[in-house]
């Protein structure tokens, strides 16, 4: 009898206990936040969306630059080199999420808002087109700045060789392989954005982004 009474007291204490709030959003809350973001993106004025997309293209270019500079003089083994290079590339998506820029790959999550019928297919496709073009222009602008700054001459032009090697590796692969590598890449980018959305602080977002982005770069996705 005393054991039963003791158990009831413990159960009552547990029911009244205050448990700490979770340090990240639950999956359902992430989806709701992603849907709301999709609606916002679909209704952005074209000029604003384009400028934000240019910033995203520039940020990803910064990540790519960091990646190629690292590769130009790495004495690590192939696997370790890819993983550390992937961590360098994370800079791009971290800047995109923290600064609120518009990235085409991350904006694929707008399908959540489309699924809930909060936006139309035409709105989504229009947003994707504007953002893709903005990303392209922003990346080209950074290419121009990097060229004019002579970054490619660093380390006895080893950085230039690294850039050419990375680019050549992308254009010499069969298009079918590139297509499916692109799908795999986008899965990992969307996972990184999803995890970043779950975070409540900048540190949460940065840590959440690291593994998915490092993984897709290390695995050679495009």
Positions of PLM-derived features:
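Alpha-helical transmembrane segments and their helix-helix packing motifs
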Residues: 5, 9-222
């Amino acid at each position: 009898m005393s054991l039963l009474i003791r158990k009831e007291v413990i159960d009552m204490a547990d029911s009244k206990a205050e448990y700490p709030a979770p340090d990240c959003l639950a999956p359902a809350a992430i989806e709701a936040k992603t849907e709301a973001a999709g609606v916002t993106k679909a209704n952005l004025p074209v000029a604003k969306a384009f400028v934000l997309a240019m910033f995203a293209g520039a940020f990803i270019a910064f990540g790519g630059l960091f990646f190629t500079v690292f590769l130009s003089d790495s004495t690590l083994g192939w696997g370790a080199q890819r993983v550390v290079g992937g961590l360098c590339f994370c800079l791009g998506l971290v800047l995109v999420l923290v600064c609120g820029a518009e990235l085409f790959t991350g904006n694929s999550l707008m399908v959540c808002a489309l699924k809930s019928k909060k936006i139309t297919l035409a709105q989504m496709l229009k947003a994707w087109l504007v953002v893709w073009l903005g990303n392209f222009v922003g990346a080209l602008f950074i290419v121009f700045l990097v060229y004019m700054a002579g970054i490619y001459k660093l380390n006895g032009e080893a950085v230039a060789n690294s850039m050419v090697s990375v680019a050549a590796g992308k254009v010499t692969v069969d298009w079918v392989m590139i297509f499916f590598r692109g799908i795999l890449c986008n899965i990992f980018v969307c996972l990184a954005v999803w995890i970043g959305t779950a975070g409540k602080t900048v540190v949460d977002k940065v840590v959440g982004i690291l593994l998915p982005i490092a993984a897709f770069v290390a695995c050679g996705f495009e």
